[in-house]
Amino acid sequence: MTSEILTRPDLGDVIVGVDGSPSARTAALWAAVEADRRGRSLWLVHAADTDRRAYWTDAETIQAVREAARDLLVGTATAVHERFPDLVVTRRLLRQEPVAGLQEAAGDRGTIVVGSRGLGGFSALMLGSVGLGVAARAEVPVIVVRGGDERPETGSVTAAVHDAADLDWLLLAAAEAEARKAALRIVSVWNVLAHVGSVASMLDDLDGIARQRVHEVKALADRVREVHPGLIVGHHVETGTSTPGILIEASGRTDLLVMGRGRRPLGVGPSLGRVAHALIHHSRCPVEVIPSAFVTEAGQS
C-alpha cells in the first residue's frame, strides 16, 4: 500500500440508455434517483444506429425511426420530471450503434446506466449484446440495474475487492455510499482453489496466506476511512469455493454491488471476467463495474 495523499473522487453526470423496453424505463427512473442524489445532470440517450441502417433502409424509414426515438426520449423525460421536477435532464438522439453512442455520451467522467433486458433487435440494451459490450468496453463506470422496485433499501453499498490495487475504484464506491448516506461494506472472497490451485495441498501455511488477505482488506478499509472519516466502513473476508455464488448471495443484502474491471490482456478485447459476468446476470441488486482505466482524483498524488 502506497503512502500517496488521497482525495475524494467526484461522482459525474449520469447517462442512461433508453430503448423503449420496461427494463430501460426502470433504469431511467433509477438513474434519475442517482443523478438527483449526486446533484448531477441526467442524460437520456437513444442510439438509433441510423448510420448503419442507412446502408439498406430507405430515407422514409430512417426518418420514422428518428421520430419514434424523439417521442421515446420526450416521454421518458416527462416521466422523470414528474418525479424530479428540478432535475436537469438532457435528451440525446445519436446516430451510432448503442455501445459507441453511450460511450460517447458519457465522455471521460460520466457514469453509464443500462437496464438488465432490452427489446431485441438493433436498439436493444440486452445483456449478452449491448449491455455486456458497454460493461466490458466502457472506460467509465457502468451500472446494470437489477432487482425489483419493491425491494426495500438496506442502507449499505457493498464493494467486492481483491487486493490493494483496488483502492482507486474503492474510493469511488465509498463516494457512492456517502452520497446515499449508507454504510460501505468491503467484501473479499478467499477461494483457496482459485488463488493457489492444485498446489494447495503442498503449501504448509494456507492459514498464513488467508491472514495476509485479511490484513490487506483491513488496510483498504483504513485508507477509505482516512478519506471518508464520517463513513461507516465494514470489512470482511469470506471463505468459499464459489466467488460468484458468495457475491450473488451478498447482493441480496445491499443496495448496490460495486466491483472493479481488470485490464485487458495484451491491451485488446473485452475484459469482463466470469465473476462480473455472473453478477450482472444474477445479482439481486444493481451492479456497478468500474474499469481500471478510469483514473479518479483519488488515484493521483
How would you label these PLM feature ranges?
Residues 1-10, 23, 60-63, 79-112, ...:
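Structural beta-alpha unit
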Residues 2-59, 155-204, 225-228, 232-233, ...:
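Small/aliphatic-rich secondary-structure junction motif
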Residues 12, 29-32, 44, 50-52, ...:
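N-terminal membrane-targeting/anchoring modules of bacterial envelope and secretion proteins
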Residues 25, 33-36, 42-44, 66-73, ...:
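Conserved N-terminal glycine/acidic-rich loop preference
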Residues 43-45, 90-94, 143, 185-187, ...:
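General small-molecule cofactor/ligand-binding pocket signal
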Residues 113-116, 142-147, 287-291:
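Short beta-strand elements of ligand-binding domains
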Residues 114-133, 154, 242, 256-282, ...:
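Glycine-rich, Arg-bearing micro-motifs that act as flexible, cationic patches
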Residues 130-149:
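Short, structured interface segments
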